[in-house]
Each structure stands twice: as structure tokens, then as C-alpha cells.
Amino acid sequence: MRLRPHRAIWLFVISAVVASESQPYTQVRAGPSPTTASDDVVLRVIVVDTAEKAQRLVTRLNSGENFIAVARAESIDPTAGAGGLLGQVTLSTLPPALKNALVGVAPGQLSSVVKIPTGFAILKVVDDTDPANRNMNAASSADIPTLATKTSVRYVIDLSGLVEAEAVLQAFPKPADWDQNPRTICQMRRQSMASSQKSLEDFLSPEKPPVGRSPFDLMQAHFALGQLHAYYGRMDRALEQYQRAYQTARGGVPAATLRMLEALGVAHLHKSGMDNGSHRAPGDMCLFPPPEHGRGSGGSYDKTSDSRRAIEHFLSYLKERPDDHEVRWLLNLAYMTIGRYPDSVPPAYLIPPSALGSTEDVGWFRDVAPQAGLNVVATAGGVIVDDFAGTGRFDVITSNFDSCGPMHYFRNNGDGSFTERTSAAGLDDQLGGLNMNQADYNNDGCKDILLLRGGWEIPQRKSLLRNNCDGTFTDVTTATGLAKPATSTQAAAWADINNDGWLDLFIGNEENPSQLFLNKGGDGFEDISRSAGIDRVAFTKGVSAADYDNDGFVDFYASNFKGSNFLYRNNHNNTFTDVSRAAGVPGPGFGFATWFFDYDNDGWSDLFATSYVTSVDESVRPYIGLAPNATRLKLYRNAGDGTFLDVTAELGLDKVYMPMGANFGDIDNDGFLDIYLGTGNPSYASLLPNVLLRNKDGKAFVDVTASSRTGELHKGHGVAFADLDNDGDQEIVAEIGGATPGDSHPLRLFENPGHGNDWIRLRLVGVKTNRAAIGARIRLTVENEEGRTRAIHRVVGSGGSFGASPLEQHIGLGRSARIVEVEIWWPVSNTRQRVVGLGKNQTVEIAELARSYTTLERRPITLGGRKAAP
């Protein structure tokens, strides 16, 4: 969710405007600037919190340390993940202190330390002749493919206010133990935003003497104030400030005029969506493509004035930059909102309707969340679908990235509806948290919750919420030893690393080393990170666990936003070795969601690793027949010998999707696992359809987003697959919403229309193995009506790293299938348990080493009172 480098420059220079008069820039390098408006350079920056630390870094850099690596490890600026890349800058538009600091600095050299309101900055002028700098966004490892040259990848414009909100919260005074109390962080967020808004309003006051306020300063101040309003969705006030910034740019900062024009278009389009209810009661408005490409119900807005203004701004922009694919895409979306796509779109900018459809029809997955009572409107967050009440029915729990936003716990009533029981469950105080997952850490038979906080922002404590088996939860984070140190994280995986029957916990942190906690019999956890060899800093955004080499011990994969990913092979003694390079799975770079799954049913866990390239331009290039320039996600097929093969292109996944939340399931019960990707980034310009990919017999993935009607345009986060109506097929539960309160959105529950194939659900209960059976392997042999047999493989777990499906395994069998045998491998007892005679289309419970199984009643219900699918 962090904004990417070309847009991050706004924060860097806006900080000069946000500063109060008592905290101006300190001029380090004196003398007039020799630059002119044509002096464009590419800059990198490192920002730290003290002058002493900055000077130490200068010494290190001058001694030969790599600037990109130091920026990633030390910088507190939002550009850190990209090695401090600010992008191409016109020097004459910079504040005087920054211009002066760069006087006489040649390409490849450093500036002196510059005091800015967010800290102390070191600038570097990038040398384009240096091969190391020709790919501006190259990851630190040579194994990672670069994004391309700096002119090839166009990052999305920053329009949301999140970067500004993060910066002011970072700088805000903090009381003792602030990172241990979510309510304190909520108060800090509100106070820091209010204080910054007042500072900007004071700076822009007409009563303030004009001395020292250049056109650049005024433009940036208006833009920054607009961002603070946009953060909360106050778009009328935001647009007023953006308009003033645009007028100021036209009069005194011509280099910024086009960017401001695009910002106006994006802001008007966002306001249009808000005014038409697309963020509160969207119905089909946000589903892409709209019915008949914008004609008919659900495809257009009733109030169109702001959409029309957006069109005007986008057209003006495209006259100057006709090859800007991001703005071209937004222009087509704007025409859809007024019901004039494709007929009224200028031919030069039209994205043809033929590019928007699916080649295969999987039926319409209708959103029934409002009818089912899943009435939650929230920012970005995670989702868990599982039985938390012991009723045999799947409940739904969501989290909230907003520092002041609560969790929501919806109890399944068993009649197709859900009732919110957050307060009754004791979860009112669980504010914030971008992601979460479930596990039975104490083996009491009731699923607990791990809530992860601080992802993309300041460090915060996580919360382990023990299920009391009576409909309530108790926060046991401190008691179990998980509260300190507070870290920034949204990535964690549960696994029994030593086969002692207790689930251990891997936490993938961002700016702190990753952590591995050994479960001490359900009473607490011991931090063994250092001795285990996994305490590395890599801005980890996803973690997955599986026994990839089938040696009986679980391994981990860490997906990292900085540098290459890590494949940690279990050494059978509570230590791990990173074998990612030898195994051929360094990842695509800019890693995010990830998971192990057996996509081809050969009995070996394959590996899916996404790349989070925040470029609308790159994501929409296939719609206009262009190949992307940026790095793509990766699908690695397990070769069965400790190595993996990159089959991304071979299976049709060689695209840029901008995925965040993601998970897998079997939408058509054919036995092959499909994928749903939640897309976007915080910017209000990031309007990309979420993506549903159907697995065709383990040989290809086909995009069925359009035919399924699951292409929600707003930000997709936690994803889960689950059969919520007990009719034998999996629904898709998608937590939708951006990173700011002004981009909140309702949850989506896409009801599966059914495909006529058979299925079985297996609820495994560990006895020696952990009670939830996480890590147990299932091999199910089926015979079709022609007498041919095949094997279907599953591993018990909640799925992907961002969103959690039920631990009860739903397995599609295909059409007219007969179950020949179910074989379960239990890790702790190291036994293979075979069950024969199972009927299809039912749910059964199988306990470890038991001689029989139990059939569980799962009565089909009607979601939201609608007629259930046959």
C-alpha cells in the first residue's frame, strides 16, 4: 500500500511547506543556484531523524557503501523501499535550501546534510551513465529482475493524503508505551492531522505577509492541505485546494501544471463516486466492466457533474501527453460513469470493449453481502472466514487499517444471515490492523485470532486474541510474550516447526528483523529468531508455510518488498537455511502476497509470489495491446528435487496486476485451485478491477473476471474462499476499501452460481498433531464415470498470506466422481491414515488415528433470503 517513488517527491517537498516558522530549513550549502527550469536531474534521498545519524551515514556512503542499500535499511522516508528514489526533478522548482544543497553536486555525488521538517536529508544526484542506475527500481539482489529504465514505468499519481498522514504521525510527539495501546495511536492520528491542517491554514492565511512564500511553496501548501481533506473524504474542500494549487502552478510553477491537472481529474472522479454512493451502497456500480459497458442498470451514475469535470481535465491532460495510459484508462472509466462509453470516448483514447471481456463464462457471482447482513463499511483490512463459535457454521471477521477503526465480528445465524457481535465478543478495543489470521494456538478446540498492526506505517503491538470457547475473546498478547517489541507487520504464518504438536509463529516484519516464536505448550512463546537464523530485515509483506520438500518438516517462504524473497528450509533442529537462490525462487521483486499450493495436483507444493508494482499504466497496458515493462508476479512449479521452475509465462500469468489481498480456492469444484487477486494502492487514481483467474487443469490460468462480475474496481484487500450457504460451492469474501477513511467501502460477498460438479468437505482434528491439523496433507483419489482415476492434493491451512479461508478443507471432485480413497498424512505421528467408503457432496470429520469418521450435518441455507442455488 505504500506509494511509489515518483509520487513520493510530493511528501519530500511538501514537508518544507508544512513546517512552522519556528522550524525552517537549515541552509547547509550557501550561494546562489545556477540552475534553470530546464535543469532536470534524477535524485535519491535518505531521511533520518537526527543530524548525528545523517553524518554517520554520509561517512559510510563516502567510504563506498551502496546508497540504495543504505536508503532501504536506514531511511524513514516513504521512498525507502525504492532505495530513496525521488525520480526526475526540475531543480528550479525546489525550495531554495534544497537547490542550494545541490549546488556543485555532480552526478554520482552527495549533497551535504539538509534539515527538513521530517528529519535530516542526504541527496544524491543519480548518474545515468552508470549501468547500476539505468534501472531505477532494481531490487538489491542480482536475482531480481529490474522494473526497466526510469522512463519506462509510470507510477500512479499520489492522491489520497495517506503519505501526508503517515508523515505527520511519524513526527508527532508520543507518550510512553504509545505503541502498546491502539486507542492512544487513534488519538495521536486525530491530533496530528488536526495540527497539520491548522499549520497549513495558518501558512496560507491571507493575513500572513507574502515574504518567503514563493509560488512553489504556495502550490505545495494548497496541495498538501487538499491531501489532508482528501484523506477524510472531504472532497469539496480538497478540490478547492487542488484548484488553487493548479492556478498557482499555472502562474509560477509551469513544470507542475500537468500533474495538478491530473490531480483535479482524479479528485472529481473520486467525488463523483462518493456522491453517487459507490463507497456506501455500491450495488453493481463498482463492478467492472459495467453491464453492457456502461449502458443499463448499474453501469452509470445518477449525478454526473463531477464525472464530466473529470473528463474535461483528463482530455486537457491527454492533449499534452496522449501516451499516458493511466489517464487514458481513467478517462474511459469516467465515460462509463456517465453512461457514454464507448460511443463518446474520442477514438484516439478509447480502450475497446472487446478488450474488457472474458473468453470463458463461469456464471455471475452476485454480491449478497447487504442482504446477508454483512453491513460493514471500512478501510483496508484483513478477513477471516471460519467457525469461531463451535456451531459448525462459518463466521466472518474483518479488521481495519484505520487507526481508529474497529474489528467486526459477524456471527453466522444459520439462516443465511449474519449478526454483528463485536461488542459481545469483547473485541471493541481492537482498533487498527491491516491483516489477521486464525489458529488454535493452545489446542483447546477453539480457533484464536492473530491481529497484525503497523503494516506500511509506524510500529504497533500485535494482538493475540484467545477464543474463550464461549463466544468471547481475551487479549493474551502480553501474557504470551508477543507484545514487545512493537513492530510494523502484516505478515505471519502458523506452523509446527518441530513436530511437537504445538503451533509456532513466524512474524514477517518490515523495518525490524523477522521473528520466530516457539510455542511453549500453549502458555506462551519463546523468541528463537536469532538462533533459528531468520532474523533478517527485508520489509517482509507476506509469509507462507509448507513442507515443500516433503521431508516431514515445515518450511517458510518470506515475500519481501525490499530485495529478494527467502525460502527457509527447515533443518530439523529449530534452525532454518535460506535456499531461495539454489531453489530458484528469489521472487519477482517488490514482493507482497504469497502462498504455497499444489496448482497441478502432483503432490508437491508449488509457490505463488506476487509483485507489487504500483502502476496503473503498467496494469492497463494489456487492454490496449501493449506488453508491460514492469516485473510480473511469479508462479514456481515444484520440481520435486528441492528446486522450482518458473512457469509464469507458460501458464498465462505474465502480467502486471498490482495485487494486495489475495487467496485461492476452487470456484467450479473441478479439483484445481483458482486465484482471486485484490488490486490497487492508496491513491484515488488506483481504480483497477480485482481479478479472478480460473485454473484449467493445472495447465493455464484464464481471466474470468468479466464473466463472473467479480471485478470490483475499488481497493481489494483480505480475500477468503468459503461455502457460506452449504450448497457445495465456495463463495468469495473480499474485504474492499482503501487505506484512508475517504476511500472506505463495503465488504463484498460474491455468491457462487454453481457449476454442477461434486465436492467433499473435510474437517480434520489433530490428536498428536496440533488440534487444528494445520500442516496435515490430504491426498484424495477419485474415479470418474469413464473409470479414470486421478489424485487431488491439499494441505490444511487458511490459504494465502492476505486473507484467511476456513481450515476445514473444501475439495472439488469434478463431475460424476467417485471417491476411491482419502489419505491423510499427520506430521507429528508421522502416519498415513486411509479412509475408504466416503460418499461425495457431504462434510465429514476425521480425527487423527481414528478408525472411523463422523458425518457432519451442514444444512443448505439461502444467503440473504434469496433463493438458494440448486
Question: What positions do the PLM features span?
Answer:
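Proteostasis/folding factors centered on peptidyl-prolyl cis-trans isomerases
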Residues: 28-45, 73-74, 97-136
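Peptidyl-prolyl cis-trans isomerase
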Residues: 57-97, 127, 131-134
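Beta-propeller blade termini
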Residues: 380-390, 411, 432-446, 489-499, ...
